[in-house]
C-alpha cells in the first residue's frame, strides 16, 4: 500500500517521508526518506499540524476563501457537495459573484475529491447560475482541475436540476473509511476516528 501511494504521488510532486521505520529497499523516483527517533517524529508531527489537517480532511464543512463553504456528504449511493456562498448573492452583479464563488468552489471541490479519495457518482450543487456560458466556465474549471487526477474522472455536465454530475473510478477506500469506523453509540449512523 505504501509503495503504491508513494509512486502515485511522487509522480506529480517530490515527497519527503519522515518515519520511525527504515525505508523500503527501493524508493520511487522523487521520494526522499528520513528516519527519525520517536521524539523527533512527535515534534515533526506537531510542527506540521498533522492532527489538525486530518481533522479538516474528515470535516463535513470545508471553508472557501471569501467566506463560502463546501458541505460534503458521503453516502452509499453517491457523494454530494453543496456550495454555499459567504453572503447572500442578491446584488445586481449577483450572477458575477456567484460565478466567481463557483470557480473557487470548483478548484477546492476537485482538491477535496482527490484528498478524500471520493469515487463513484458525485453531484455538486453550485450556486445557481442562469447563463449557459457561466455553467460552461465552471465545467471547464472542473475539467482542468480533474486533469491533474491520476484516477479516471469524467465530468458529465449539469443535470436538468442544475447539479454538476461527475464520476470517478474507485481505486481504494475513501479517507473517511480508512481513518474512521462506524459509531457503536449511535448504531452506525455516525463515524468515529480509529485508534
Positions of predicted regions on the chain:
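OB-fold/S1-family RNA-binding modules
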Residues: 1-76, 178-195
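Conserved glycine-centered short motifs in functionally critical loops
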Residues: 66-195
Amino acid at each position: 500500500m505504501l509503495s503504491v501511494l508513494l509512486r502515485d504521488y511522487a509522480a506529480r510532486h517530490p515527497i519527503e517521508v519522515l518515519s520511525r521505520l527504515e525505508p523500503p529497499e527501493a524508493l520511487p523516483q522523487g521520494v526522499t526518506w528520513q528516519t527519525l527517533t520517536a521524539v523527533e517524529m512527535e515534534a515533526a508531527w506537531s510542527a506540521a499540524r498533522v492532527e489538525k489537517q486530518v481533522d479538516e480532511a474528515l470535516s463535513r464543512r470545508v471553508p472557501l476563501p471569501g467566506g463560502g463553504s463546501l458541505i460534503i456528504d458521503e453516502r452509499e449511493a453517491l457523494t454530494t457537495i453543496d456550495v454555499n456562498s459567504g453572503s447572500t448573492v442578491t446584488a445586481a452583479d449577483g450572477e458575477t459573484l456567484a460565478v466567481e464563488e463557483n470557480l473557487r468552489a470548483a478548484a477546492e471541490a476537485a482538491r477535496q475529491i482527490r484528498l478524500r479519495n471520493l469515487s463513484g457518482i458525485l453531484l455538486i450543487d453550485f450556486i445557481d447560475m442562469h447563463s449557459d456560458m457561466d455553467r460552461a466556465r465552471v465545467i471547464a474549471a472542473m475539467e482542468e482541475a480533474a486533469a491533474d487526477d491520476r484516477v479516471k474522472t469524467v465530468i458529465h455536465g449539469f443535470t436538468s436540476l442544475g447539479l454538476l454530475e461527475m464520476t470517478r473510478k474507485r481505486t481504494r477506500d475513501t479517507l473517511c473509511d480508512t481513518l474512521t469506523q462506524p459509531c457503536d453509540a449511535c448504531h452506525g449512523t455516525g463515524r468515529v476516528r480509529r485508534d
